[in-house]
Amino acid sequence: MQTTDGYDYFAFISYNSKDEAAAKRLHRTLERWKLPASLVKEKGLKPRPMQKLFFAPSDIVPKELEEVLKENLRASEHLIVVCSPTSAKSAWVGFEIDYFCSLGRKENVHLIIVDGEPKSQNPDTECFHPNLKKHFNDLLSANIHERHFKLPYLNRQRAYVQLIAAMLDVKFDAIWRRHRRRMIEK
């Protein structure tokens, strides 16, 4: 089943195995995300546009790993890079970034920081992979640790909404106000 613009997957989630818990949480959140009806109608989007995401290891079929990754990167409209000090050192994350950018879809690369600091110049805390810096002059990202609220859960939710708004090319407030209201109602 194809999703948007002829792609099999809305997005490919690139992460290091040490960040699997954060990547799984992101994967679950995005696949279950439902857009406000007003936004669906106004922008002509699907109510659940991110239902189909490529997430390894659950979506990997036994073959040669590099070929499987290339095939699924080609089949994905977006690349989400889960950024952390461990992913910044990962050869596979670097490969996925390089290959996706070689497809001519650099504008569809999105970053979410789950650990570490951007542009820290310290390899123990740097969260951006060197290949990101090679392809992009300015790196914009959602950061689950950015403190807007006292509760870490709300900061994480805000970062997810930032990521979703960027991928769908909609205004952050168009999604955030509605999502925040739903969280308060619960």
Label each PLM-derived region with a short phrase.
Residues 1-31, 52, 58-76, 85-94, ...:
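C-terminal interaction surface of TIR/SEFIR-family domains
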Residues 79-81:
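Inter-motif core of Ras-like GTPase G domains
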